[in-house]
Amino acid sequence: MSAIRSALKEQRPNLSDSSLRTYSSVLSNAYKAVYPKDESIDIKNFSNDGAFMKHIATMPHPSTLLAGLVVLTKNAEYQKAMNKKIVEHKSDEQNQMKNDKQKESMIPKEDVQLALNKLKVQADHIYKTKDTSAKAMNILTNYILLCLASGIYMEPRRSLDWTEMKIKNKDDALNFYDSKTGTFIFNKYKTAKVYNQQTEKVPIELKKILDKWVKYNPNDFMLFNTKGGKLTSPNIATRLNEIFGKKVSTSALRHIYISDKFKNMPSLKELQETASAMSHSIPQMLEYIKK
């Protein structure tokens, strides 16, 4: 058992194996980024919130790392940053009031899982029979699309992040999946001008799925259409609508993921009303919350 995993287990004995794997992975990657010259990991260094907060500031999606740092160190600065992220998510939820069409696209997370399970059964059969027909490749592409966009295996990203994802003949102007290192390299995405190139370690379960697809996929792009061209954002929207039998976009899947992840949190309106009644700010109030 790694030093990080052991330390996490000591701090939180009831932490699930899945959470242990996820936290161990993101913490290990963050440590290497903050202390690139260290040959081994010194658990005490994770308490250096100044160094790690600088690294976190460069990340577009630091929630999982922050959660891991809170469990591992119980550091107050990490807890404050995590609380701030929760408030931001709730603010997004409040500001993006769903109109009737958006409400229709909001489905339970369980329905997303069911759709993924159905496609997995079809994909397993195709791999087993070595079917390379256009219909089979179309089904496999849908399966991979949902694996990437559903939020089941990783935090869901925007359509652009996947339409520009190559798996062969790397292009530095586009995104790339490196199967050797199990890493996503994002060069082309909505906030690239702010965050520049972003790399993200692929969760083990997803890596197994993608590596199998890379060997089977004859195309340079991760996702492609029946004519061999890369999928576009409208193509992805159409495919998701077909998969779910209703209008469910990548934006809706991102919203479903956030709503499910923070489903036990009170609404931002409730937080604001309570904070106002107690004459302090929401971040101040959240500092009193111990989880």
Predicted regions and their residues:
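Basic, Lys/Arg- and aromatic-enriched nucleic-acid-binding interface segment
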Residues: L116-S159
